[in-house]
Amino acid sequence: MTDLPETNLTMLTLVKPEGQLEVSLERRPMPTPKPHEVLVKVLAAPINPSDLGLLFGGADMSTARASTRDGLPVITADVPPAGMRAMAGRVGDALTIGNEGCGTVVAAGDSPEAQALLGKTVALLGGEMYAEYRCLPVQMVMPLPDGTDPADGASCFVNPLTSLAFTETMRMENHSAIVHTAAASNLGQMLVKICAKDGIPLVNIVRSDAQVEILKGIGAQYVVNSSADDFMDRLIDAIVETGATIGFDATGGGKLAGQILTAMEAAAVKRMTTYSRYGSDTFKQVYIYGALDLSPTTFSARSFGLTWALGGFLLTPFMAKAGMEVVGRMRKRVVDELTTTFKSHYSHEVSLADALNVETAQAYNAKRTGEKYLIKPHG
């Protein structure tokens, strides 16, 4: 066993009853792995939008201010009444953060499965990754090839498996093409590459000409700019050409989900040979999987007939539904294509302490396309 420190620096997020959110670092006792567990030195962990939902939640980050405790940084921000209602279930509980990461196994329980991972570079899933070390069951780690850069291994789960889950869902629900929003993101670029390899027509929605060029540059065929005056016309044309009847929306709020359903219906009506006042009988599905826009989701159901659905999508329930065989195949593909299809790009690397700099926190909480932060707990 590697000589280990006695404590493990860990990031915590706490909502206080008086209407404040506090994010801090705390030195906790170093965990000891049980027989079927491994202790991993966390070398890299991405900041994903799903992490930010827990990290800052409904806090007003424009009110964030800095302090210290035991020589470690603390961020405090005010939480408006609506945010307190949304986070009522976590008031008073200091929660750990970080869905995924990558590191080296430095200690292991005495089971053969755990011992076999000693010294290996592994990808991690299971929360509490914004820490120097993480102890977790062997089934929650995925061995990576020798020499894997921790920055590549850090994002093995959330974005790669979510993008693959989109194409699997498309097949399972008998669709043949996809519409995707916020498509210039790391996840969006992965989906472009997956669909190109698998021959799946993909309509990409972005919000600037610069993002159009990014996706065109990696081979995307259908890219439409939601800020353009002719957005709806171009979206309908792309859906007519592809036949897309399923969409995945990362924005969540606003009118985009409704616009996608409207465009799908317009494309379906073009194929109808007989008029119906109830609209087409083509089933149209949009799943919301993100919350980049925190405003209410708005749409007019009269715009897309009566054969449609709008729902939520989360990776974990999908994997439970898909089963071990499908998930195993997805994981193998991620490892096989880790430095190609599923390579993530980071604009900033920060330490645990740097992540609690107020200006830095406000920057990564803005969730700007093209900006992705990687936490390196050991520098």
Please provide the spans of the model-predicted regions.
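Adenosine-nucleotide cofactor-binding segment
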Residues: 197-275
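C-terminal substrate-binding/catalytic core of Rossmann-like NAD(P)-dependent dehydrogenases/reductases
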Residues: 232-236, 240-241, 290-348
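Mid-domain Rossmann-like dinucleotide-binding core that forms the NAD(H)/NADP(H) cofactor-binding site
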Residues: 117, 156-229
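Phosphate-coordination loops involved in phosphoryl transfer and adenosine-cofactor binding
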Residues: 174-176, 244, 283
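C-terminal boundary of histidine-terminating zinc-finger modules
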Residues: 152
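C-terminal hydrophobic helical "lid"/dimerization subdomain
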Residues: 2-6, 261, 266-272, 316-379
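A structural motif shared across PLP-dependent enzymes of the aminotransferase-like
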Residues: 126-139
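Glycine-rich beta-strand-centered segment in the early N-terminal region that forms part
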Residues: 31-46, 60-126
